[in-house]
Swiss-Prot record:
Catalytic residues (positions): 203, 311, 359
Entry GO MF terms: palmitoleyl hydrolase activity
The protein's Enzyme Commission number: 3.1.1.98
Glycosylation positions in this chain: 64, 86, 104, 249, 451
InterPro entries: PAE/NOTUM
Name of the protein in its database record: Palmitoleoyl-protein carboxylesterase NOTUM
Length: 527
């Protein structure tokens, strides 16, 4: 916009110097130049990707007559932003995350400290959202050209509540809100042409996807009277049924193990749990269906899992916040927890799991560029998309007997983005789980004093937080400075200085090495 103003001013100045005015000779041909510049740079221009229409999500609240409510009784709604490609028939529906509450105390605390997750009273009429909801191709290579829907979270029930009436003075309408959004979208003329819907969610929103995706597909089919290809992307919602490091009295949401919190929460929420999972788990164990490793095996629609092996929320619930530090025993527990997460994720058809300490990855501006084994997340999703294209073809073959289900007419759109890959894709390309393989690290040549060399290592070592060099750095709890892998070990009383001394190197030399070199040296060097 600034460049346009400068150009405009310069052109006008030059014309005035030469005796021309905007109303004379200039007004014929030269005015066309200014008109085009204005159109390209006008933030309200319908053809500009920078226009407000394509940059901001617009709020649509449900009418007062609707029978869905946020916790406090206010009317919920959702935000939409059209694709910059007017022809796009692909939609991304994002479910917001934000923990939950499970009794009167935790719900009251939520009302006081996170009111926007409790009520729609102060929701803005428009929002600019980033991460996987950005329309910037650099930030969001995979979904920047999708029509996008953002559903704010105000039910505190992991998107599961179905009871119409209040419970303890509060509404828990999570699954009912999703039904209402889907029903409202199917009245949208643009949405009626939809070919593909990606249900995406982070944290509590990811659990919402796992619990509702199959049911919402059935609802869409019924409303549109045809099949639509549905798939899911679940971020930071693979919570584990794993013994906590220490016991807790469960008075605070961040301190309560999943089983205790979910058992209590279900009494408030009256949740809608997928029938297949509920039946498989049996009476009294339905709470397990909120756990990623349990519900995933019952899903009918392809769902891609994105997870930090050392998920920050999981560490809190397991009583081992990473920056709290502690003993070697505690660090060993953290490693075992990460290893268990990796083991359970192997069942996922599509997965990207890095050994970082992170949570809600898709909402960050750098989400696409986190890597595992030198393959970035957005590249992994490209391979997954190629796999999905194969699944779409299977669906088309099944409905060919009824041409009305697939006939869409000639499309005026010739330049729609196509999948980057096609044909048979090696499954390992969209199943990436970090393992800190030493064999991938020892390619570094490290010069040690006294002719010391790297010994032959085992194929893998126990998982280590931050062993992935693309992890976002942690901030030291005291200094606030970015922490290296070495700093993290020192936080757990590992005497790095003694190890360095035994290897004949200084701490300064050790700190100058990158993460992979440090791991290789500390875990593989002969002493």
């Amino acid at each position: 916009m600034k460049s346009y103003l400068i150009l405009n001013t310069l052109l006008l100045s030059l014309l005035k110097i030469n005796g021309f005015s905007k109303s004379s000779w200039f007004s014929s041909k030269t005015s066309l130049i200014f008109d085009r510049i204005n159109k390209l740079n006008d933030p309200q221009s319908s053809n500009s990707i920078h226009s407000r229409k394509y940059q901001y999500f617009q709020l649509k609240k449900f009418p007062n007559s609707t029978n869905v409510r946020c916790n406090d009784g206010s009317i919920p709604g959702y935000y939409t932003r059209p694709s910059t490609t007017n022809c796009s028939k692909k939609w991304l529906i994002f479910l917001e995350g934000g923990w939950y509450c499970f009794n009167n105390n935790t719900c009251e605390s939520r009302r006081r400290t996170h009111y926007d997750l409790f009520s729609s009273e102060f929701w803005s009429s428009e929002r600019q959202l980033g991460g996987i909801l950005s329309n910037n191709e650099r930030i969001n290579p995979n979904f920047h050209d999708y029509n996008s829907v953002y559903i704010p979270y105000c039910s505190s029930d992991l998107w599961s509540g179905k009871q119409l009436e209040k419970t303890n003075g509060l509404y828990f309408h999570g699954s009912r809100i999703l039904d209402t959004v889907v029903d409202d979208l199917t009245q949208n003329q643009h949405f009626k042409k939809v070919h593909e819907v990606a249900f995406v969610g982070s944290s509590a929103g990811g659990i919402g996807v796992l619990l509702n995706i199959d049911r919402l597909k059935r609802r869409l089919k019924k409303k549109l009277k045809r099949k639509v290809f549905i798939h899911g992307i679940v971020d930071s919602a693979w919570f584990l049924d794993y013994p906590a490091y220490r016991q807790s009295n469960c008075t605070h949401i961040y301190e309560c193990p999943p089983e205790n919190a979910l058992r209590n929460g279900m009494k408030l929420w009256n949740p809608r749990i997928p029938r297949r999972c509920k039946k498989f788990q049996g009476r009294g164990r339905e709470w397990k269906c909120f756990m990623g490793p349990v519900i995933y095996r019952h899903l009918k629609n392809p769902t891609f899992i994105i997870q930090s092996l050392f998920d920050d929320a999981q560490l809190q619930m397991s009583k081992v916040p990473i920056l709290e530090g502690g003993s070697n025993k505690k660090f060993s527990y953290i490693q075992q927890l990460g290893g268990f997460a990796a083991q359970t994720l192997r069942q996922a058809k599509g997965v990207f799991a890095h050994s970082c300490v992170d949570h809600e990855i898709l909402t960050k501006s750098n989400w696409a560029y986190v890597s595992v084994n030198n393959q970035r997340l957005h590249e992994t999703l490209n391979y997954w998309q190629a796999y999905l294209e194969g699944e779409k073809k299977k669906i088309k073959k099944k409905v060919q007997k009824n041409p009305k289900l697939i006939k869409t007419g000639k499309s005026p759109c010739k330049n729609l983005r196509k999948p980057k890959f096609s044909g048979n894709i090696d499954q390992s390309k969209y199943q990436l789980i970090d393992s800190c393989h030493i064999s991938q690290i020892t390619s570094y040549k490290i010069q040690l004093p006294h002719n010391r060399t790297l010994s032959r290592c085992a194929n893998a070592i126990p998982l280590i937080p931050l062993c992935n060099p693309t992890c976002s750095p942690l901030s030291h709890p005291i200094s606030g400075l970015s922490m290296s892998f070495i700093d993290l070990l020192e936080l757990y009383n590992v005497r790095i200085n003694l190890i360095a001394k035994s290897l004949g190197i200084s701490m300064e030399q050790l700190r100058k090495m990158n993460t992979q070199q440090q791991i290789s040296l500390l875990y593989c060097s002969s002493r």
